[in-house]
């Protein structure tokens, strides 16, 4: 019996992750949103080539959009040209939009994407975090705590 072919494409699971967001911000709440993508964007995203490091969510005409999310052009398609950093509409219910807009209105809060993933049905979803910026000393404390946890686990393992 032949083995199934491994294509390297992501059918479900995390396609891109914003690792800096959890370090630079304190995440207060998370919301999962759908995202409007064209065919070539989905194919490029399934290859795991998106970047969320500079991305943020904002409001335009009463709707939520994701700005500065980089999805490179899909190499397999000739006619599929799209703006690699263009705004992408987020699919949210009105109550969720109002919650996010209220968070943006508060001073010091922003909405950042934490990851882009495909759900079991194969639909692209974005996990948004309502975040507040961390001060430099908070970042240092987080690093010290993480290092201590790592050292503690190493010590307990070697007992």
Swiss-Prot record:
<dbReference type="GO" id="GO:0005829">
    <property type="term" value="C:cytosol"/>
</dbReference>
<comment type="function">
    <text>Required for rescue of stalled ribosomes mediated by trans-translation. Binds to transfer-messenger RNA (tmRNA), required for stable association of tmRNA with ribosomes. tmRNA and SmpB together mimic tRNA shape, replacing the anticodon stem-loop with SmpB. tmRNA is encoded by the ssrA gene; the 2 termini fold to resemble tRNA(Ala) and it encodes a 'tag peptide', a short internal open reading frame. During trans-translation Ala-aminoacylated tmRNA acts like a tRNA, entering the A-site of stalled ribosomes, displacing the stalled mRNA.</text>
</comment>
<dbReference type="Pfam" id="PF01668">
    <property type="entry name" value="SmpB"/>
</dbReference>
<dbReference type="InterPro" id="IPR000037">
    <property type="entry name" value="SsrA-bd_prot"/>
</dbReference>
<keyword id="KW-0694">RNA-binding</keyword>
<dbReference type="GO" id="GO:0070929">
    <property type="term" value="P:trans-translation"/>
</dbReference>
<keyword id="KW-0963">Cytoplasm</keyword>
<dbReference type="InterPro" id="IPR023620">
    <property type="entry name" value="SmpB"/>
</dbReference>
<protein>
    <recommendedName>
        <fullName>SsrA-binding protein</fullName>
    </recommendedName>
</protein>
<comment type="similarity">
    <text>Belongs to the SmpB family.</text>
</comment>
<dbReference type="GO" id="GO:0003723">
    <property type="term" value="F:RNA binding"/>
</dbReference>
<dbReference type="InterPro" id="IPR020081">
    <property type="entry name" value="SsrA-bd_prot_CS"/>
</dbReference>
């Amino acid at each position: 019996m032949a083995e199934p072919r491994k294509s390297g494409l992501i059918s479900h699971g995390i396609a891109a992750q914003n690792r800096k967001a959890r370090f630079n911000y304190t995440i207060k709440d998370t919301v999962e949103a759908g995202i409007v993508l064209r065919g070539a964007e989905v194919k490029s995203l399934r290859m795991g080539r998106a970047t969320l490091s500079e991305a943020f969510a904002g409001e335009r005409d009463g709707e939520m959009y994701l700005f500065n999310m980089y999805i490179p052009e899909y190499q397999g398609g000739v006619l599929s040209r799209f703006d690699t950093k263009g705004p992408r509409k987020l699919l949210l219910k009105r109550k969720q939009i109002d919650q996010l807009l209220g968070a943006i209105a508060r001073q010091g809060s922003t909405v950042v994407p934490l990851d882009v993933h495909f759900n079991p049905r194969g639909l692209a979803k974005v996990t948004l975090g309502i975040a507040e910026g961390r001060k430099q000393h908070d970042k240092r404390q987080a690093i010290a705590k993480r290092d201590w946890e790592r050292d503690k686990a190493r010590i307990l393992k070697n007992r």
